[in-house]
Amino acid sequence: ILIGLVGSEMCIRDRLYMRANNLTLLTDLYELTMMQGYFKNPTNQTVIFDMFYRTNPCGGAFAITAGLEQMIEYIENLKFTDEDIKYLRSLNIFEEDFLEYLSNFRFTGDIYAIPEGTVVFPREPLVKVVAPIMEAQLVETAILNIINHQSLIATKAARVCYAAKGDAIMEFGLRRAQGPDAGIFGARAAIIGGCAGTSCVLTGKMFDVPVLGTHAHSWIMSFPDEYTAFKTYAKLYPNACTLLVDTYDVLKSGVPNAIRVFEEMREEGIPLTKYGIRIDSGDLAYLSKEAYKMLAAAGFDDAVISASSDLDEYLIESLKAQDAKINSWGVGTRLITANDNPAFGGVYKLAAVKDADSTEFTPKIKLSENTEKVTNPGNKTVYRLYNKKTGKIRADLICLADEKLDADQNMVLFDPIDTWKKTKVLGGTYEVRELLVPVIREGKRVYESPSVMELREYCQKEQNTLWDESRRFVNPQKVYVDLSQKLWDLKKDLLEEISEKALD
């Protein structure tokens, strides 16, 4: 079933794709109107924006962050072309001096991010932008667009792969994706999340990842009979011979004809290495069990039995519970669209401001009637605490950027909303990792992304730091994201200050 192979060189085709598709105007109009407002009323402020999300996708307990490489490429290639300026001028909104500024625009700020493939949780910054206010404002929309999409698909893929319990998941969703880019980059994210490969040839070319595929019902129907179709395909692809057996009747026609072809291959001395059948409809549990019996009786008990047909993590988990004899899964629509959770929900919020004549950032906070939507102020970082014996995540701690954690010190963690919920972590029992790393400094890339297959391997290790209770699909155990005492005090003081002003 593996038609393509992984290339040996680091792929730069993705960067060429991003350059060929100028994404500078991939922004909401109000980012540009605000930029003109800042331009006309200059403050020379440097600001900090945090990109984070509030609710885990698909009812789970975690997410997988993805899309960082494309975000970096977007930042590197920010440039308003003459055509861009001409179009903006035609809107009759922007003045000539502002358009002149845009014609020479470059991003000069710093960006920190959590590496792709990392397990992440609500309210912790996935991306932190530190830049002049006009620059930080412009990049909001594209950062959200890129990170939200790929993180959603990577998370869905991680769930699907977990349900498969080690079986290969093939990403088959291109034809159902919401457009070419969703198909290309969704497949990339799906592989980061754990898929073995994709049917999308362009994704394979751009990212040097395995491309996978069998054949369609139309192949069978174009021949006089099913056997001839199978035999012809087997001659063409003897080392990747997976036969689709449900065009007419799985058990009466498809499997018997597949067995006949396999027997003939064996008699002709053709090695049966990567071979098997695919079932795309019907009762997959029953049909796979019966097909396995037939294959085993003919001496082909090692044949791969692949299934497709609107699969997702819930159906795969159910089929596993029914002891379905399936060991390879083609997952399309419900993966590439994350159909039960169509949006990731990431947001981009101002956290701090520094005036031109100041050396310190002033923390900012956004209020809400919903307590969980009140933002965390200031210049922050994120630490992850691991249990030293098990390697499992104990908690994440959002701190102010100047705070350092000492793993030898005792620590009291508390819930930032229900502050009476506390736990003590003894020094020497945990390890600490800072999650945010610099990826852009003064507008230049300082981070080289691993290959997609390396990110996939990293993501598997990341997921192994979760307890199984946090990976189950129904009522998963929450992983706690706490605030340091210093950050919590700052947040409380700002809330009290705003509350007092409201009473004046």
Q: Where do the protein language model's features map onto the residues?
A:
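Structured loop/turn residues at beta-strand edges in well-structured enzyme cores
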Residues: 6, 272, 324
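Buried, small/hydrophobic-residue-enriched core segments of structured protein domains
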Residues: 13-46, 54-57, 93-94, 99-121, ...
